[in-house]
Amino acid sequence: MSDNKTGNGTSRRAFLRGATAAGAGVMTAGAAKAQSADPLITERQDWASYLGTGVDEVPYGMPIEFESNVVRRNVEWLTASPISSINFTPIHALEGTITPQGCAFERHHSGAIEMRKEDYRLMINGLVEKPLVFNYDDIERFPRENHVYFCECAANTGMEWAGAQLNGVQFTHGMIHNMEYTGVPLRTLLQEAGADMSLDKWVYVEGADASSNGRSIPMEKALDDVLVAFKANGEALRMEHGYPVRLIVPGWEGNMWIKWIRRIEVVDRAVESREETSKYTEVYEDGTARKWTWVMDAKSVITSPSPQMPIKHGPGQMVISGLAWSGHGQITRVDVSKDGGITWETARLGKQGDTKALTRFYLDTQWDGAPMLLQARAMDDTGYVQPTKDQLRAERGENGVYHNNCIQTWYVNAEGISENVEVS
């Protein structure tokens, strides 16, 4: 074990020396403390002295002003323009697993577009017996399904590949959301058109926005769990999430989830579009390219404590919480380390639903006030174990961007303030 460190890195040996010294004289405290009379309890407050807001004041419910900081945020220097850019879900401030549409990250290639349901058309062509054009009402007539799935951008955590970069879990891991979608299985629409559904065929799905964003999907996946969705979390899709209709490709990278879908073409082979050649592929140091890397491997991150969620209560009882997910299926276990990966404790998993959806995990523990190096490590039902960053670098080199599912480390100091670091 080395004492070397670079950038925001730290060594496990140096950390253990500091933690032992910091925690030597700390006494633990209970979750609640006895105190003198609190005027918020003993005195009548303004909100109990006048009538509140009527039922018609806010026809569509909005968050209260005291939660106005729980919003999507972008990194201004990341892209040249917000029109072709991305912002980040405030996962540090959310609980459970369902992401409100208004908090769910956005990724656009030419900006979000406005389209009325009445103007919506979806064409299915190519290797089909009868090319069809559906309007919005047509799609709603087919048998529908409801499923909860996560959507993760392939570049989520991509800026962290070279080292600890951004000091906030919203920015390191916030290119993800998890919503309940209502839609029609893609296979239903393909059957309606008499498509050639041989497993050696592909479908090419194209969006209606100015970028004409499109991706090729193997027929085997298209016939499995892909949805043509028109609702999210029980309501119409928001504009930024593809209103009125988008594609849902469970477990696969977010670029496949085409928004405002206008055309589905059945083809003999992959189209090799811009988004699957010059984009969303990675070139190794030996010149070979890594492509068709659709599935998002098992990943987890601690959301609290984290740089945007300091420990405010001091030593004593605490809950370490986070999120885990896998594009291969379901999370079966999450381990948490408080010493940078030297020792691990198994976390408690929240109630699970659909596969390929977020899982909430908790470690109910005690904090003695000493510094911590917090990590989470996820496992899924295929037996896959979330790797360290060094393991990913050994496999893919130093210049990766996409599919970074490495273990994340937060350094928590004696004051409860967290920082993004990399351990070696």
Residues covered by each model-derived region:
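N-terminal secretory signal peptides
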Residues: 1-14, 23, 29, 35
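Short, locally clustered residues in the helix-turn-helix/winged-helix DNA-binding domain
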Residues: 20
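Structured, non-membrane catalytic/scaffold regions adjacent to prosthetic-group chemistry
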Residues: 36-424
